[in-house]
Amino acid sequence: MSKIEKMSIQGVRSFGINDKNKQVIQFFTPLTILVGPNGAGKTTIIECLKYMTTGDFPSGSKGNTFVYHPKLAHETDVRAQICLQLKDVNGEPVAVQRSIICRQKGKSTECKTVDCVITRIKHGGPVSLRPKCEEMNKEMISALGVSSAVLNNVIFCHQEDSNWPLSEGKRLKGKFDEIFSITRYSKALETLRDVRMKEDQNVSNYQEEIKYLKENKEKAREIQDNLQSKEKQLTVSKENVKSIESQLEPLKDRLADIQRNLFKVIRLENEIKALESRKRTMEQDNQDLMEKMEKVFQGTDEELNEMYQNQCFVREKERKLNDHQREMDRACKESQRLNREKGELLVQQGHLQLEADNHQRYIKTRDSLIKSLAVQLELDGFELTPFNQRQTSNFQMLVKERQEEVEAHANQILREFSEREAMQQRQIDEIRDKKTGLERTIELKSSTESKKHTDLKKVKYDLQQLEGTSDRLHELDEELQKTAHALENVEKSCNLEALKGEVVQLQTQKSELDRNVRELDQEMEQLNKHTMTRTQMDMLKNDKADKDEQIRKMKSRHNDELISLYEYFPNKKQLEDWLYSKREDINQTRDKLARLTKELVAAEQNSNHLSNELCQKEKQSASFEEKVFDVCGSQDFNSDLSQLLEDIEKTSKQRAMLAGATAVYTQFITTLTEENQPCCPVCQRTFPSEAEVQDVINDMQSKLCLVPDKLKAAEDELKRKEKRKDEMMELKPMRQMLSDLKEKEIPEIRNKLEAINREIKRLQNDVEEQESLIVTFVSEEARAEACLQDISLMEQYQMELRDVDQKIAHYATKLLGVDLNRTVQQVNQEKLEKHHSLDNVSRRIELLQNHLQNQQEQVQQLKSRVNELTAEKLHISSNLQQRQQLEEQNVELTTELHCLSIEIKESREQVFPLESTLQKLQQEKQALLQRKESSYREAQEKVNDIKEKVKKINLHTKDIEKYIQDGKEEFKEQKESELQELTVRLNECEELKEKINREMVTIRQDIDTQKIQERCLQDNLTLRKRIEELKQVEEERDQLLKEMGQMKVTQMEKEYQELENKRETLKTNHSLTLGRQKGFEDEILRFKNELNEPKYKDAEEEYREKMIVMRTTELAIKDLDIYFKTMDQAIMKFHSIKMEEINKIIRDLWCSTYRGQDIEYIEIQSEPDEGISAADNRRTYNYRVVMIKGDTELDMRGHCSAGQKVLASLIIRLALAEIFCSNCGVLALDEPTTNLDHENIDSLAHALVEIIKSRSRQRNFQLIVITHNEDFVELLGRSEYVEHFYRIKKNIDQCSEIIRCSVSSLASYLH
């Protein structure tokens, strides 16, 4: 059983927020009493307990008023913390802490829980967790062992909600439904009903699904058989393909070798032709070069190379020209670099000039500021500018001294005013201390006066009470005698031994019923254990019936078809034999068809090959004709070529003549010019006059001028014709090939193509005939195969039926010894009857035990009453002896009060003149502070003005000094000198560029003159090189002819044709086999895809699992019906039993507590809700509290007084706590004496003591009573169950304090 041990409170309502204000309360067992005046904070403790256990703030506050208000704390955020130490239902220690923060936002406050910590002891040490608030609440409910509704409405019920048992009907119903958890159980029943309806619907759905799953299962078996057949055919086809490929591979290798050799032959032929053409071209080029040369060198190669090397001075000239060009480039780069440096120097010079101008401006500004400040500070010697360094330093020193004087003056003013202010403050403090002392004296004496008044009232009250004590003493003697007599009569009338014997007999009967219930539980467990076996057996029987029906349907479906093929209904073996023979016929026909198809494909391939070859030959012929026409311009190639050769020869001679004319004319002109008496160089005749000589020379020179142009034109024409000749020579082999194509190759291909087309028509007719025959055979085979699948399935079903029979026999063996006539429902009904009998016996035992306990309690109550009366008699006797002492205290207190009143009046008269004097001094102090502030501000402004001007002067002085220290003036002069020097160097560089340019022009002229002679030597070198290359070409041609003669070209071509024919045959077979294989693979893929479809993939497994699910679901629906009825009956029974127990406790507590005669007892009546239909199946109740007067019962709400209402609510809470708090012995009563008269308060105290006494055997029982009625506390304190109580009061800071007090001190406090 759980219990609470200790709690600390800080920052909640009136409990302070500082650590010193933290209050700790330890809860006693079995009774904890909290007493204090209204507003002291008693109910706050109940609110804290409720918040710690449920997480709920007090109603209507949302936590905003639960925490110490931020305005009272003068803070924006206020934190509150509550710690609770308890033991859970297992007796384990648990510490819980919750922290709250309240934040002021404008006029409103916001409060929330910021931290939750729960600490447990695990593995010998504390373990702390920080769960969320909702998880924390669940942890607390689990630790305490009671629901949240019981914590809120029974255990920790707030004073404002304590009368909820007499609230209006809807609210009362809600409270009791929460306590009984009616809503939760009703929802459980609704959930059971919903689950059952859902499962009913599921069974219907399962039946529909099973129908389709069964069809899918059968279809999947059919597809699987077809797949296996096609896979076997595919395996055979793959083996055929491998065999053909193994024959093709060596053929391909050999053909590739031959083809490479043939390509090599063609390449050699092309290379030989190219070499021959190149040889002719080279010979012609050499001839042309010799004709073009003026003189062919007759010496050796060494002599020619030596002469050519002697011409190297041209190279030297060119090298020198390149050197001059590089010097020119360097001079240009140097000129560009000097120009860039000149530009950079000009930019630097501009910056330096700008800095010099700024330097002069800074000097003028600084001197102006110095002169102005000197006039302001009345300093002499600074009238004339500019100032030198010495004057500037002297000025700064003088200004510093004058500045220190001004600051010293300002500080002097500040010290004088501070001294006067301190003296004024001392006077104020003296008068304030005197005034405060008088006020404190008045406060203390007023407090003492108030306390004395209270003591005086108490003394007078005690004296008044003692006036009737003698009569009360007499009454106590009479009542004590009556109670002792009643106790003696009750002890004689009790028959306790007989009651105990009957209880023992009933307990024996209860043990026997317990044994019967356990036996039924074992039988129920045995039946449940074999439920699955019985289900499996039923499913197997259903499966057997289904398979029998499938076999019958298959026979009726294929009977006509099979009889038409075989004249009887065959078995699987007979049908497979027939199919085998039919497939042999199909294979033979297919082989024949394949052979014909192969021949047809080969013929078609030959036809296509010949067609393509014909097309290529025709295209090649047209291409050759087009090329010949493009080059020749006509189809007469030979005549065009002869004409072209004649033109080339004529042009070559003309070119040679023009080339020689230049040398001849030059020699003639030289001869005619140099000789004194020249003669004609041709006819050797002398010229009659110089004029004729000159005419001849002029004529030769004019012709000589025309020779270069004519020579160039002749060379161009010769090159053009040579190029055309080369193109025509290249076309000569093409011309021969064109003739062969037209006259031989194309007519032969056309004849072969016509013969092959006739063969193709014959083969097509044969293929069509074989294909129609295959269609007939395949149709018969397909019909037989369609039947074969079902026949195989029939035989499989027959085998499965044998397995099913064996399984049925196996399950029947397992169920031997099990009473199949007793069902789970029968055993469950018998178990319910035994439980009902057991409950009746248990209630009878409990009734007898309660009766026995009541008699024992009655005796104990009478004994307790005798003890109480005796104690009260002794107490009254003691009080009578204290009367003289109380009268003396009355006189003493009256005298002290009179003296205190006079002293307070005198102190108040002394306070008034001190207040006026204090006010006057404070006004004088304020005026002094204003003058002090004004004077100091004026002096400070003067100092700041001087500092600002000095700062500006220092800044300009710093810039001036920096310019001088950096040497900017010298740097400026240096850059100007560098600029002049750079200008001189730039002019020198330009002069050098002019000189180099003149030398380069001279060298170029010399080089052009020498290149003509060098060209002649170069032509001789080229001719000799070409002759050497021609020899190499002839040797290479001879080598290729020799290599080509070693290869057997004709034999290779024949072998290539034979191997090609064989390869085409194998390729045709390979294509046909691959085609069939592709068909098999497509069918296999189609079958596999069908099997991989969701409806076929696991069709049989899904069918079996769905059947199991449907059967088990049907059984579960039956169990749900049983459980629903059982649970509904259990809820009704639980509710009625608990209400009987609650009403019994209420009746006993009312009779023992209520002292009036108008109400015999009260009880809670629960009635089913008439507004709920029977179809809804929800058990709901309406509750009302009634009071019994004779034979009449009335609703207590509206018919009872305020005191009766409080007492009834309290008793109902006590009864609910007795019933629902078996795991938690805590109960808190907040102001239970509200609206009760004195007699009912006494009886309530007596009832609580009796409850404590009856529950004292429970080690963790705790009753917490909060009250302001100290008489009620005193009555509870008379019992032996309480030694200390807590007094709640507020301290001087108006913060709540919890003080532990002894019960023995309560009497002295009261009296």
UniProtKB/Swiss-Prot annotation:
State the needed cofactors, names only: Zn(2+)
Chief location: nucleus
Keyword annotations for this protein, in alphabetical order, are: ATP-binding, Chromosome, Coiled coil, DNA damage, DNA repair, Hydrolase, Magnesium, Meiosis, Metal-binding, Nucleotide-binding, Nucleus, Telomere, Zinc
**Reaction catalysis annotation:** ATP + H2O = ADP + phosphate + H(+)
Q: Which intervals of the chain form a coiled coil? A: 189-341, 473-613, 711-1069
Amino acids binding ATP: 13, 38-39, 41-44, 67, 159
State the PROSITE patterns in the record: ZN_HOOK (PS51131)
According to its UniProt record, the EC number is: 3.6.-.-
Which residues make up the binding site for Mg(2+)? 43, 159
Q: How does it assemble?
A: Component of the MRN complex composed of two heterodimers RAD50 and MRE11 associated with a single NBN.
**What is written about domains in the entry's comments?**
The zinc-hook, which separates the large intramolecular coiled coil regions, contains 2 Cys residues that coordinate one molecule of zinc with the help of the 2 Cys residues of the zinc-hook of another RAD50 molecule, thereby forming a V-shaped homodimer. The two heads of the homodimer, which constitute the ATP-binding domain, interact with the MRE11 homodimer.
- Could you identify this protein by its name? DNA repair protein RAD50.S
Q: Which gene encodes it?
A: rad50.S
